[in-house]
Curated annotation (Swiss-Prot):
Coiled-coil ranges (or none): 130-165
Transmembrane segment boundaries: 97-117
Region (Disordered): 131-157
Entry membrane topology: Single-pass type I membrane protein
Gene Ontology biological process terms in this record: negative regulation of DNA damage response, signal transduction by p53 class mediator; negative regulation of intrinsic apoptotic signaling pathway by p53 class mediator; positive regulation of protein ubiquitination; protein import into nucleus
GO CC terms in record: cytoplasm; extracellular exosome; membrane; nucleoplasm; nucleus
Official protein name in the record: Pituitary tumor-transforming gene 1 protein-interacting protein
Main location: membrane
Amino acid sequence: MAPGVARGPTPYWRLRLGGAALLLLLIPVAAAQEPPGAACSQNTNKTCEECLKNVSCLWCNTNKACLDYPVTSVLPPASLCKLSSARWGVCWVNFEALIITMSVVGGTLLLGIAICCCCCCRRKRSRKPDRSEEKAMREREERRIRQEERRAEMKTRHDEIRKKYGLFKEENPYARFENN
């Protein structure tokens, strides 16, 4: 199609075909996951991997129990399962290690961001003066130039007055006085 040529509205059958293709792509993805309503207790005394296929389940290593994750609290309570033996998401990381790792990574990221912000601000400040400093320097320079112009005008006016009244200073006021 040539550039600049307007296209008409999309035919209705194309919209239906696109919607059907999207639906066909999403069905296998939805079928692979266990529904969140499936009881986690069905996977008790099985493997950790089978339990954690459902994202709403928590695996307790001490008693090989698959439990519903307590969504009301961020961390599972100790009465449910100790943090050192609780697994969620992946089987090879317990909750204690996960919490410590996430804290260290989060703290490192925050510290890195803070350091980057400080360095950028310092570099920006040292690189060029800000607008108020530039304005103050410009005004100071303008005042100095006006003052020099006024001094030059005053000097010429004073010289004219001295010439008028014969008080003009000589080139060398300390010339030797000669009597002839």
